[in-house]
Design a protein with these regions (language model features):
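Short, structured segments at the rim of ligand-binding sites
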Residues: 2-476
Length: 476
């Protein structure tokens, strides 16, 4: 196996034929998944895409979702106000702001993508279900509240429905630091008797969320904490850089061993979130799928190495600059085999998007999912657009058809929605994508950015009545 995520020939897995058919901010972003009143009209939005147009031009990448959803809770640890820059306009950020405000913090808009957060007035240490259910990353409030106050009560998290993603490793880390964790009816109560104490933490598996939560909890603990088998993702390094800019002593972030010497005081800071590698990769794939030519700006090319490696094997031309990459296609797309891995391997968050691209390639491609559960839920929707994909467990075999056809589809999670956007852009005809609140969780103004590249895309409101069969129709 190579670290860039490409499967060697000997690692390919046969797929059973029997499974062939298995099936902006500050209050302006409203979550479409929120429950409404009994008599209210259940409105939502959909994207309507007329495909077949090449994407051309430049696109600016926003701040990293996976970094900012940990950095915002981390401001709880500060003993002074913090300024956070390059904040993406996504619904997950608005949820973080809502939770901070509910806890007692103030969130003040300073300029586009820039906010001042003052958490010194926090009096509540509880994050209720109605807030936590909207975002899986709400669990970072556990580490931040516990690390600063020695107590928290946080509901089990929500977010994308990607199968069994327990928080046992998070609780293991807290326990190692001296906390007592109790789970009762979906609420997690975490307390300490004499404060948190530094300790050695070894994770049973590589886990991004637990690594970041352990950092949050340990940064003010008494003594030295050593985290082994730590995840290495760029957003972990960004969280550590943010905390270090406040006076924390975190060493080794980005390696599998992180050392944290606890401090008593963290000053305020002004810090810019890193660019989003997954958003960058998504636009890179969209450019390739449409045969376009796009300059993807405000990126860190080193964070894109595994994505670039795989795309080049598929036949995509990529030019790298200091803080940008240019994506173009000069010839046919070709098959490849990929396995997702923790960083620096090919990211699971790019797997659905690259699958959509491989539907347009020549030959048989294979993808083995090595990180997430149920990451292939989008496959049935791509099949509606003419994709030939067989799934057996954690392996998908894609027979490149060279073309896709527009169809009505639904996003089942964030990255699945991105894959359907890419497929719709490349397809012949019109594609409508519903449940786009998933997409808006992690992509800032995707509609506007794509339209600026030449895409024919429109956001339209839909109502429940559109999904109710008429009297002469079968309910199905």
């Amino acid at each position: 196996m190579k670290d860039d995520g490409v499967i060697l020939e000997t690692e390919k897995i046969a797929v059973s034929e029997t499974n062939k058919n298995n099936g902006a901010l500050r209050g302006t972003i409203k979550l479409q998944c929120e429950e409404q009143g009994e008599h209210a009209v259940n409105t939502a939005n959909k994207f309507v895409i007329k495909g077949g147009r090449q994407l051309r031009g430049e696109v600016e990448i926003s701040g990293a979702k996976n970094a900012v959803v940990a950095i915002l809770p981390a401001t709880i640890l500060a003993d002074e106000p913090c300024i956070v820059e390059n904040v993406p306009e996504i619904s997950d950020v608005e949820i973080c702001f809502d939770i901070l405000r509910e806890l007692g913090a103030s969130v003040r808009y300073l300029a586009p993508h820039t906010y001042e957060i003052d958490t010194r007035a926090i009096k509540s240490y509880s994050v209720p279900y109605e807030k936590a259910r909207k975002m899986r990353a709400s669990y970072y409030f556990m580490g931040a509240l516990l690390g600063n106050f020695g107590y928290c009560r946080v509901s089990m998290p929500g977010g994308c429905p990607l199968g069994d993603r327990p928080i046992d490793q998070h609780l293991k880390a807290f326990t190692k630091l001296g906390a007592v964790c109790k789970v009762d009816r979906g609420m997690v109560d975490i307390t300490t008797q004499d404060g948190l104490k530094g300790n050695q933490i070894f994770f049973d598996c590589v886990t991004v969320g637990a690594t970041m939560n352990a950092i949050l909890a340990a940064v003010k603990a008494d003594g030295l904490t050593v985290i082994e088998n730590a995840a290495k993702e760029p957003h972990i390094m960004d969280l550590a850089s943010f905390l270090n800019s406040m006076g924390a002593e975190i060493m080794g972030a980005g390696t599998d061993t992180i050392k944290i010497r606890g401090v008593k005081y963290l000053r305020g800071t002004s810090y810019a979130v890193i660019p989003d590698q997954i958003e960058a990769g998504t636009y890179m794939v969209a450019a390739a799928a449409t045969g376009g030519n796009v300059l993807v700006k405000n990126v860190i090319p080193k964070h894109l190495e595994s994505i670039i490696s795989v795309m080049e094997k598929i036949g995509v031309r990529i030019e790298q600059f200091d803080d940008a990459v240019r994506v173009s296609v000069d010839g046919p797309l070709v098959k490849t085999s990929i396995k997702t891995r923790p960083h620096p391997g090919f990211p699971t968050d790019m797997q659905p998007q690259i699958s959509a691209l491989l539907c347009l390639a020549e030959g048989t491609s294979m993808i083995k999912e090595g990180v997430s559960e149920q990451r292939f839920q989008y496959v049935d929707e791509l099949r509606r657009m003419g994709a030939d994909i067989q799934v057996d467990g954690k392996v998908a075999v894609i027979e490149g058809t060279g073309r896709l056809t527009g169809a009505p589809v639904k996003a089942c999670d964030l990255r699945a929605g991105a894959a359907l956007m890419i497929a719709g852009l490349a397809a012949q005809g019109v594609t409508t994508i519903e449940d786009i609140f998933h997409i808006e969780r992690g992509y800032a103004d995707m509609e506007g950015k794509l339209r600026a590249l030449g895409a024919e895309i429109e956001k339209r409101a839909i109502t429940q009545s559109e999904n109710i069969p008429q009297p002469d129709q079968e309910a199905g």
